[in-house]
Amino acid sequence: LQAYTRASLSAQSFPADLGQRRGSTTGFLPAARLHVRVIRVTVPKIVAEFSMKDDQRRHPLRDAHTDITSVESVPDTAQTRAPAYRLAFTDNEFMCRDELRPVRLQLELLKPEMMLDAEGIVSTIVLFGGSRIPEPAKKDTARTKTLAELSHFYDETREFARLMTLKSRDSGGKEDVIVTGGGPGVMEAGNRGALDAGGHSIGLNIVLPHEQAPNAYVTPELCFNFHYFAIRKMHFLMRAKAICVFPGGFGTMDEMFESLTLIQTGRMQRVPFLLFGKAFWQKIINWDALADAGTISDEDLDLFRFVETAQEAMDLIDNWGTPTTRDSIPGR
């Protein structure tokens, strides 16, 4: 061997081929360039580099885990008990300071990103919907008559997730993976349907005062927890191949309108965007009034479609066509 090629990626945050590798649909990813350098080396150098204790990190430096273990056995003195002596990255009080917020935001972006990459997840089907919608067998426990009437959407969510996961399995479970908020109600139904089909699914949980253990149907290795709503919503969309919105409350509408706004303003490609339950959504939101008032354009009403059943949603997604991105905003 006379030479080997080492490829190095330079980007602000993400690998150079991230958008192509996932079929990314968002405008969040920075531009990146791939630089290839050919380095002349001898055979012994190659062997030494690639056999260093089977170390995949490719460097000879002492790792953080070793130091964490080492400091556990230091003598117990006034100095070693002092907060100043703690390793910065293991010091919870330090990590929770206001000044460390940028670091915490970055960590919440990186951890799920790296773990989803490791699992080979390329694209997702996003399910938004209410946590209070019960399954039909338990609709008698619903807080209101309307929630009981909406319980059939639990079954539609479950069936849609089952059908989509059967399709996902054709790609080895890498494409069209169901992702929910990981909680009860519609979210539970989505993860449950994926499990019905023998596939895996993602849960993006958020720490709330009144909730929530993840529902029992999320794939454990793909069950994440967030402090920041903004980063959680970003992860919902970074691999989104389609977005399905079921009846829900403020949280569902927050997720729905942020996603629609990104598409409307050309910050995200126009992916299939389906609202389950036309009667519910037309009662809750007067879409035509927004267009009549001129606060949105008539063309904005074409960014989404109403559906009632799982099969109808599958058919629309299959026939949606190639995602496009707006280069201007109608009405501006």
Task: Locate predicted features.
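Compositionally biased, intrinsically disordered low-complexity segments enriched in Pro/Arg/Gln/His
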Residues: 2, 21-22
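Phosphate/pyrophosphate-binding betaalpha-module
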Residues: 178-180, 184-246, 250-253, 257
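C-terminal functional extensions of proteins
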Residues: 275-332
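Glycine-rich beta-alpha loop segments
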Residues: 61-75, 79-204
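Short hydrophobic targeting helices and cationic amphipathic motifs
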Residues: 15-18, 29
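Short, low-complexity, charge-dense intrinsically disordered segments
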Residues: 19-20, 37-40
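Short, acidic/small-residue loops that bind anionic groups at enzyme active sites
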Residues: 198-211, 246, 260-287, 298-299
